Each structure stands twice: as C-alpha cells, then as structure tokens.
C-alpha cells in the first residue's frame, strides 16, 4: 500500500476519506451489511464502495482524488472473496477509460520496479507475465471467438440464443447484453491468465459507466483480469443526471423484484450530478488480490489478518 500511495501522490492525486457508514449502500452491485443508527432512528449500511462520495468531491472541485480503505459486502467467502477487504478507488477529472487503463498498468509497474521482483509470476501452479503492454480486448469479441458466433451491439437476441441452444449451451439471460456478460463470466473469465483489460461491458451491468456514442447498449468500461480473477474495474463515468436517474430507477425495479445486489435509487447523488461532474475516469483496484498474486498465495485469507471465522460452538 505504501508504493501505491507513493505512485498516486507522485501523480498529484489527493488522498481523502469518505464515510464508511452510509445512509444508502451505493457505488457497486453488491449486498450490504445493514445496521441502525439509534440517535437518528435511521437504517444505515457499511459501505460497499466509496464511489459516489468520491465523485461528489470531483463535482466540488477536487480533480484527482483517491482513497484506500475497507469495503464490506455481505456475500460469499471463497479463495478470492471476503466480506471485508481493502480497495483502492481513484477518480480523475478530464480523464477517460483509456487514461485510467494506462494509469493502472503504470502503477503496477511502479510496484514491480520498486520491489525489484520478476514480472513473471507463479500463482496456483500457473505462470503469467505482467510485462507490458497488457492486452485490451472487447468482451463481445471474446464471446464471439469462444462460441463461433458473431455478436455485437446490434445483434438480435433470438438469433444468438438459437445458435447457443444448438450448441447445448445453457443460459438465463433475456437480452443480448446480459447474455454476453453471462457467457463471459461462466466460460471465459477463468481462462484469462496474463493481465488483460476486458472492455465494452453491457450497459445492463454498468449503471455508472458512460455509454459508447457509436454502440448502443455498450459502455466505456473495463475490468482487469489475471490468473482468472478480477483485479480492477474502471470506466469513463456517466455524467448525465437524467441518464443516471433512469438507470438507477431500472436498478430499483430489479431490487423490488428480489435482486438483493441491485443498486438503490439515490436522489441525492443525482442531484449532485446536476451541479456538473466533468468528464471523469474512475478506478476500483483490489489490493488484496494483487498482493495474493505478488506473493503467490492461493487464498485471500492468507493476505488478510483476522478474517471472520465461524465460532467452534
């Protein structure tokens, strides 16, 4: 974490702190921990992301901000997931997804160079080279190649679904975007070994990312994968308050239908957007997973002190 901070301070980012206890669990698609504030008689949540507060700071005039802190998500535990973990989030005004990807790669190189370790890492019996430049590939292209079906933003769901059914591929999605995302998660993500930026995420799973001007339903979003795990998530931020309000209303409908991970409506954040968020590039970077790969530990529990345990009795 010291080297990550050094890099960001050296590139004129300002380190800030935002609330851990929040009236709405926003900024990510995740299930929160809930508590109650007795003095205010108000249900509150441990943060699932600092994103919406950091972007408020950008609206307020802080052009380059970052925070390193604990995130809490009331979800499953496995080799790469813990309910409490450490995240780096940064936001830069007048930047976009491409600038953020460049920054992530440069920041990781800074860590490798200062630790003086080989950029060829061994993890879970496999090798991956972190020497750059890292690949950047569209999710739609990966899915198209995997299944031998040309899929893009204007593909018809009926055409794609029938071809997948012919291949005996099971799926639950009802739109092209959700179908592409489901196929990527289930069949492709775990196969990515060398660090790779997967770009072009469907708008249905990217409520805060800017939609591409020339590809309806596709966003300027990336995730960085290595050794089959997500290391980072970033995008060109959605800055239109009307579009943001519409997307959050769609998420609220999903939540009312029983989707516990869907995002809540957040009128306060939409109101903040009305004051003007400049074009902004955002990043979320999983520090624990990065450390796992650096030191070759197969489980996230081995790089986090005092993980939660079930009582013996």
Region spans (language model):
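A translation/RNA-centric and nucleic-acid-associated enzymatic feature enriched
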Residues: 19-99, 103-110, 128, 133-313
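Histidine-anchored, small-residue-rich loop motif
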Residues: 1
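Short, glycine/acidic-rich hinge or "gate" loops at secondary-structure transitions
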Residues: 17-21, 116-127
């Amino acid at each position: 974490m010291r080297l990550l901070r050094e890099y960001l301070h050296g590139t004129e980012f300002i380190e800030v702190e935002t609330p851990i206890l929040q009236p709405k669990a926003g900024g990510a698609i995740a299930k929160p921990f809930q508590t109650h504030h007795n003095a205010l008689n108000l249900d509150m949540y441990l943060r699932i992301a600092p994103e919406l507060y950091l972007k408020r700071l950008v609206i307020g005039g802080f052009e380059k901000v970052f925070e390193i802190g604990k995130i809490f998500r009331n979800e499953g535990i496995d080799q790469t997931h813990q309910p409490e973990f450490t995240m780096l989030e940064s936001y830069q005004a007048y930047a976009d997804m491409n600038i953020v990807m460049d920054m992530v790669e440069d920041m990781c190189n800074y860590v490798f160079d200062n630790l003086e370790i080989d950029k060829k890492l061994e993890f879970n019996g496999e090798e991956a080279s972190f020497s750059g430049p890292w690949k950047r590939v569209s999710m739609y292209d990966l899915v198209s190649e995997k299944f031998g079906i040309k899929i893009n933003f204007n593909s018809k769901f009926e055409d794609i679904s029938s071809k997948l059914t012919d291949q005996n591929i099971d799926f639950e999605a009802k739109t092209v975007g959700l179908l592409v995302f489901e196929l990527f998660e289930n069949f492709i993500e775990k196969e990515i070994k060398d660090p790779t930026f997967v770009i072009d995420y469907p708008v249905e799973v990217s409520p805060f990312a800017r939609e591409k001007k020339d590809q309806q339903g596709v966003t300027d979003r990336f995730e960085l994968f290595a050794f089959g795990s997500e290391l980072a998530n970033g995008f060109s931020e959605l800055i239109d308050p009307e579009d943001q309000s519409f997307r959050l209303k769609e998420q609220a409908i999903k939540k009312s239908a029983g989707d516990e991970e869907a995002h809540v409506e957040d009128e306060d954040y939409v109101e903040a957007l009305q004051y003007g968020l400049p074009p902004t590039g955002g990043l979320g970077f999983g520090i624990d997973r990065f450390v796992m790969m650096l030191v070759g530990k197969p489980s996230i529990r081995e790089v986090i002190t005092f993980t939660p345990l079930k009582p013996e009795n």
